[in-house]
Amino acid sequence: MAEYLASIFGTEKDKVNCSFYFKIGACRHGDRCSRLHNKPTFSQTIVLLNLYRNPQNTAQTADGSHCHVSDVEVQEHYDNFFEEVFTELQEKYGEIEEMNVCDNLGDHLVGNVYVKFRREEDAERAVAELNNRWFNGQAVHAELSPVTDFRESCCRQYEMGECTRGGFCNFMHLRPISRNLRRQLYGRGPRHRSPPRSHTGHRPRERNRRRSPDHRHGRF
């Protein structure tokens, strides 16, 4: 019996523990869920809840009407956000194996930033310190996440461009960063954590901020 319960833990067959929380670290039912959300006491992965704000969803004019933001502007805004958060966390807490940002619209997933550190101790320290910090005018809510394999958490239909649930899908729709930024961030090892420089010698993040003051982000 014990072996059977262990084999179905966190799966659809498990009637006690929430499979969505186990796979994704979030559940649309929240505290009202009829199944248990077993929050980990240790993990390599942390989640920063609702941290990223897509300007296409939030941009408004003074009269409250929706302000159009182009796809190019959104990608630049997102790359700046991603680089700043990744660099800041890696410099302060330790080497990051993987960082992912949800582009879903559901309240339990929108803007969630998942950061998988190489060491569990670094993740634990990050959670303890980040919950006392602010970013971009909002309090940071960080917690350890059960997610370690993002292949199990992602919507496969979305990756193939075929998800019919849209932004309210309960599996992760991960927003990609630009190819150049991916090479810059993941191409450098733990001994090279300073922000990458362009061929001009300037740090891209600083250059982008001077060019686009409206797209500045608050530091931790």
Swiss-Prot record:
The modification N-acetylalanine is found at residue 2. This is Splicing factor U2AF 26 kDa subunit. The lineage of its organism: Eukaryota, Metazoa, Chordata, Craniata, Vertebrata. The gene is U2af1l4. Isoform 3 is rapidly degraded by a proteasome-mediated degradation pathway. A zinc finger (C3H1-type) spans 12-40, 149-176. RNA-binding protein that function as a pre-mRNA splicing factor. Plays a critical role in both constitutive and enhancer-dependent splicing by mediating protein-protein interactions and protein-RNA interactions required for accurate 3'-splice site selection. It can functionally substitute for U2AF1 in constitutive splicing and enhancer-dependent splicing. Acts by enhancing the binding of U2AF2 to weak pyrimidine tracts. Also participates in the regulation of alternative pre-mRNA splicing. Activates exon 5 skipping of PTPRC during T-cell activation; an event reversed by GFI1. Interacts with GFI1, U2AF2 and C1QBP. Isoform 3 interacts with PER1. The keyword Oxidoreductase does not apply.
